[in-house]
């Protein structure tokens, strides 16, 4: 009976990152036959990302929705997704958060966490499949994987939350090819002003254009752009000759994901939103393009069969999007 005690799932980052953590939690829960509870760290990535997957959880599955970050006293008026300017990772000198980054760089994090009963997945499908029944907790990096049983439960949780499920099956429009481009802008604007905190560069729209050209699409197709900044994304695509319809409702990730699920061809940037989308797009047989690496050359440790990788180019450091002022 002692192994029926819930194990803790540590999450951080935005809604899509949290969804990847939830999928890992479901997979591990089924594997070791124990329930899970979520402990969310809204400040640990250097930006503010509150718990967003609450609608998909039961009250007993939430252990802590705002776990603290050592050395940080958060302000009351933090904006979601914005850099926390007084975050320990941005301070001069050696801080606890910088110590953790050093441990990761030296590849000692797995050993340290294992000693305290925490199973560090580290973007590894083999580690996801080898979790001990006696673990106290699991932590990321979380990554996309395809498990039909997990997908079915995610679909059920979306339906229970009264949110359109991207895991639902769709019938394609006859004679119509629907291309969806996910164009992440948002926090990528701070790639160079806050290096090491808010991700990597913004994809050059020519990368998307090359894919459309390689597909050899005739006139009977439409392009829809899904973005956290749809006006900017639409303008960037127009600069290279791509006319795209934009999502009408800004800031609703769940609707964006649902729209992505209805595409025939989906072109993604390097983004956790796109990574989460891969879990339902690949399983439904959609053609999905995903970059081989970030602007910094990091290619990740996970591979997902059914994804077509492409070599993305990125907007240069001098581009105005990185310098809004």
Language-model segments: which ranges?
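Short amphipathic alpha-helix
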Residues: 21-28
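A short, glycine/small-residue-rich beta-strand->loop->alpha-helix junction that serves as a flexible
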Residues: 10-20, 190-192, 198
